Amino acid sequence: MNLLGKQQIWKDYQKEIADDKYFYARSCIRQTFFPGSEWAYLDILNNKLGKTVLDDPRHTTCTGIGYHSDVVPIETVMTVVARHFALMTEAGFENMTPSCITSFGIYTEILHTWETHPEWEEKTREFLWKATKREFQKPKNLAHTSDVIYKFRNEIAAQKKYSLVDIHTGRPLQV
């Protein structure tokens, strides 16, 4: 593939990432195996960068594992995701940042499905209302936590205490 083609693919991939006010969606897997990573993300954004990230204790799993295992039907997954969006909406947030890549994929897939098949969104809104008496707005911005960290990489780097360089040569450590 030529350079121009690669640049176009990269350009197509780029997305806008909100600057602040994120509704945080925890990961059922990540918080089990790497609990410090979720704490670190929240600490960096809230305390080091002064951003507002809401970690709502009412947030639940996205049911993605059950969906991908053919155990949970897509209508149920959509209703659970709609509940997450309702929690975000009720809190006054418009930007969602999921920690789990499965959740990010589920949210992305569902938003695309609703865009191309609005009848699915309408049905999901009915299910959510019947089950919880909640309504929701779709997120204006959906970005995985790794994308958010990458967005603020320079601000994070500017706060470092120590450089990971060889003190004798000034070259980056090979770790």
Regions found by a protein language model. Give the residues of each.
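Iron-sulfur cluster-binding electron-transfer modules in prokaryotic oxidoreductases
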Residues: 1-175
